[in-house]
Amino acid sequence: LLTNYSKTEVVADTSSLISLQTGGVLELSLDLFDVSIPEIVVTELKDVAGYDDAHGKSARYVLRLIKEDKISVREVISISETESRVESRVDAGEMSCLNLCRQEQIPILVTDDWRALPKLIEISLIHKRRSLCICDPRSTEQTCAGLRWHSQPEPDRPYR
C-alpha cells in the first residue's frame, strides 16, 4: 500500500464511469482518485440503469457506489454564458462535467466520448483547463491531452 499518498481529484462523465465498471477497473480507479460528478450524471446513470444489459448492470453498480459515498456528487453553480450552450458534439452531461472542473478547479475530466473530444479540448483550452483524460472503451490504453500519467508505460508499449 502507498503511504502518504494524496489522491488526485477528477471529474468523470456518465459513459466513462460505465465503461470503467464494465471493464472491471472502476473500484481500482476509486482507490487511486477522488471521483466527483455533477448531479446530471446521476440522472443519466438512473436512465441507463433501466436497461437489462451490461451497461444497465454497470450503471446500477455505479449508483450503489454513489450511495456508499465512494463517488462525490457536486452541485454545479457557476455556468458562464459560453458554457451554458450545449454544443452539437458535447451533451449536457459533458458540459456540466466541464463546468464542475472549472468551478472546483479540478484539472482532470475523465471521458470516453471520442466524438466529443475535439470540442471538449477546444472548450477546455478556452477556459484554461489543461487536462482531459480519455478512457478508450475498446482497449485498456488511455490517452491524455496535457497530462502525464501517474504510472509508467509498459516497456514494450510506450505511450503515444
Features from the language model and the residues they span:
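Active-site-proximal, substrate-binding regions of enzyme catalytic domains
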Residues: 2-107, 114-160
